[in-house]
């Protein structure tokens, strides 16, 4: 498998004005557009968290989007990514918004 096609999984948490600005909906749409799977949810800390899975090149693109763009009315202060690992298969079949 070529480097750019290696499947990875990474957890994320986004800080800033990311709740009440359709951040989850836009994250789901961007993830699906890139062909990624995973999930996104609001936390009781006022952040958004989730997990991305897919080819490393697509996950890197999504990480940049989460750090710099987000939804139009969001303001991202910080993006944390952790638990990155190579995976052999995807754990999800879609990109879901978790309530």
Swiss-Prot record:
Known tissue expression: Organ-common type isozyme is found in many different tissues.
Keyword Cytoplasm belongs to the record: no
Pfam families: Acylphosphatase
Key words of the record: Acetylation, Hydrolase
Domain Acylphosphatase-like: 9-99
A Gene Ontology molecular function term of the record: acylphosphatase activity
Catalytic activity: an acyl phosphate + H2O = a carboxylate + phosphate + H(+)
InterPro entries: Acylphosphatase, Acylphosphatase-like_dom, Acylphosphatase-like_dom_sf, Acylphosphatase_CS
SUPFAM superfamilies registered for this protein in UniProt: Acylphosphatase/BLUF domain-like
Enzyme nomenclature, EC number: 3.6.1.7
Example GO biological process: phosphate-containing compound metabolic process
Residues with the N-acetylalanine modification: 2
Active site per UniProt: 24, 42
Signal sequence, start to end: none
Entry's family note: Belongs to the acylphosphatase family.
PANTHER family: ACYLPHOSPHATASE, ACYLPHOSPHATASE-1
Protein name listed in UniProt: Acylphosphatase-1
Species per Swiss-Prot/TrEMBL record: Homo sapiens
Recorded name of the encoding gene: ACYP1
